[in-house]
Amino acid sequence: MSITNEQILDAIAEMSVMQVVELISAMEEKFGVSAAAAVVSGPAAAAAVEEQTEFNVILAAAGANKVAVIKAVRGATGLGLKEAKALVDGAPASVKEAVSKEEAEALKKELEEAGATVEVK
């Protein structure tokens, strides 16, 4: 004779809370499992997959041709000569922040052609 699920549920329903806790503990030991709830991280995983839309262009080093780099920085940012020179001399420094990927890549290419070392973050 086999015991049905209905009979098992009826037997558990008649148990006290302490008896149910002991039953769960015994089942965990016998089957090598844990009754702990699994952690679900749905929204956090979706945020990690989200693609970055804003980038910062960082001048890591001016390189050998500092004058050309200063001109490129002035053209890209609209800074005056003194401000652009200070930015280039203060490398590593942020040239532009929160720009699109296309704009960041174009600026990186322009600065690298002038001889600078550039990072896009």
From Swiss-Prot:
Keywords: Ribonucleoprotein, Ribosomal protein. This is Large ribosomal subunit protein bL12. Forms part of the ribosomal stalk which helps the ribosome interact with GTP-bound translation factors. Is thus essential for accurate translation. It holds the Pfam family Ribosomal_L12. Gene3D superfamilies: 3.30.1390.10, Single helix bin. The keyword Signal does not apply. Belongs to the bacterial ribosomal protein bL12 family. It comes from Vibrio cholerae serotype O1 (strain ATCC 39315 / El Tor Inaba N16961). InterPro entries: Ribosomal_bL12, Ribosomal_bL12_C, Ribosomal_bL12_C/ClpS-like, Ribosomal_bL12_oligo, Ribosomal_bL12_oligo_N_sf. It comes from the Bacteria. The keyword Ribonucleoprotein applies. One of its GO terms (molecular function) is structural constituent of ribosome. GO terms for biological process: translation. One of its GO terms (cellular component) is cytosolic large ribosomal subunit. Homodimer. Part of the ribosomal stalk of the 50S ribosomal subunit. Forms a multimeric L10(L12)X complex, where L10 forms an elongated spine to which 2 to 4 L12 dimers bind in a sequential fashion. Binds GTP-bound translation factors. The gene is rplL.
